[in-house]
């Protein structure tokens, strides 16, 4: 092993909106805040999802390829209809099927919990 993954970092124009959204989706607290970087993780000793301030960030236009996605996240859920309802209440934008966009426009998929993950 060369190293261990620290964080997956997403550019976003509004740190609070992105971190709060993902904190609610993942059920994890915001563990770090600075002027230009916030982290959502299990606690401050674990890797997590981080947000880097990028005022000029242009969100992907998926499925239209004119502004391609650089990354997307898959979120395993136990109750797909309930998860869809809850992410919409948090401000997610429905793109197609089980694909949504977070407040900064990053696509993510809601996927039924696979049997190996239970």
Task: Provide a role label for each language-model segment.
Residues 2-4, 65-70:
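Short glycine-enriched loop/turn motifs at secondary-structure junctions
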Residues 40-44, 100-103, 113:
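Active-site beta-strand termini and strand-to-loop segments that position acidic
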Residues 56-62:
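A short, acidic/glycine-rich surface segment
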């Amino acid at each position: 092993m060369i190293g261990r993954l620290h964080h997956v970092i997403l550019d976003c124009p509004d740190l609070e909106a992105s971190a709060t959204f993902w904190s609610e989706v993942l059920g994890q607290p915001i563990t770090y805040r600075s002027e230009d970087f916030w982290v959502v993780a299990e606690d401050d000793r674990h890797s997590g999802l981080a947000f880097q301030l990028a005022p000029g960030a242009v969100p992907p236009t998926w499925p239209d390829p004119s502004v391609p996605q650089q990354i997307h996240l898959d979120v395993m859920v136990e109750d797909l209809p309930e998860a869809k309802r809850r992410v919409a209440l948090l401000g997610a934008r429905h793109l197609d099927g089980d694909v949504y966009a977070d407040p900064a426009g990053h696509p993510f998929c809601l996927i039924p919990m696979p049997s190996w993950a239970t």
